[in-house]
């Protein structure tokens, strides 16, 4: 039997988090208000097992190999759910919580139609596996989706580090929502 080799973690979006968890477990990884997570907590082993078992993330709705995540009042929970989904080889679509019910329903239907409906678990992610579906604002009508694969973002991260050097590894302020 010919098994595919696992992907090089450096070619996956969550690869740097895995490395930091191993090399610098006590580094602050995510800080939100008075709450935070250290790098070691970004392993998500138990959460991943639960996600695989249920086929969805805690705040997500499974739609084939896509999972529609809705922004919650807790951005830290959304980031954890996002990481859990992409590590299972699925694609996380982040919905805008301000979408009207009918827009949300249309996005769910579109994601369901484009996803693999197989009940089998998704294979482990590869660099070419789609991991993220984002949406335009919808200012001209219905929001339009765009999909990114792991390699596209991993390459962006690599170029950022190459261009900006050590300062690219510093703290980042992300004041907006993921959607």
Locations of regions flagged by a protein language model:
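Conserved AMP-binding/adenylate-forming core of the ANL superfamily
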Residues: 5-9, 13-18, 24-60, 103-104, ...
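Short beta-strand->loop structural element characteristic of the AMP-binding/adenylate-forming
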Residues: 30, 48, 67-111, 145-147
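Glycine-rich helix-loop-beta junction characteristic of Rossmann-like nucleotide cofactor-binding loops
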Residues: 56-63, 162-167
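Conserved AMP-binding loop of ANL adenylate-forming enzymes
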Residues: 70-73, 164-179
């Amino acid at each position: 039997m010919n098994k595919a080799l696992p992907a090089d973690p450096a070619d996956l979006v969550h690869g740097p988090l895995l490395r930091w968890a191993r090399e610098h477990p006590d580094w602050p990884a995510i800080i939100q208000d008075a709450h935070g997570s250290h790098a070691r907590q970004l392993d998500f082993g138990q959460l991943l097992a639960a996600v695989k078992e249920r086929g969805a993330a805690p705040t997500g709705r499974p739609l084939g190999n896509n999972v529609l995540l809705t922004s919650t009042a807790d951005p830290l929970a959304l980031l954890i759910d996002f990481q859990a989904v992409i590590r299972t080889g699925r694609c996380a679509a982040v919905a805008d919580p301000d979408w009207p019910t009918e827009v949300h329903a249309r996005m769910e239907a579109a994601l369901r139609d484009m996803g693999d409906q197989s009940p089998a678990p998704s294979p482990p992610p590869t660099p070419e596996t789609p991991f993220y579906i984002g949406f335009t604002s919808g200012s001209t009508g219905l929001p339009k989706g765009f999909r990114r694969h792991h390699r596209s973002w991993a390459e962006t991260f690599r170029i950022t580090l190459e261009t900006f050097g050590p300062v690219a590894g510093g703290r980042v302020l992300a004041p907006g929502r993921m959607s």
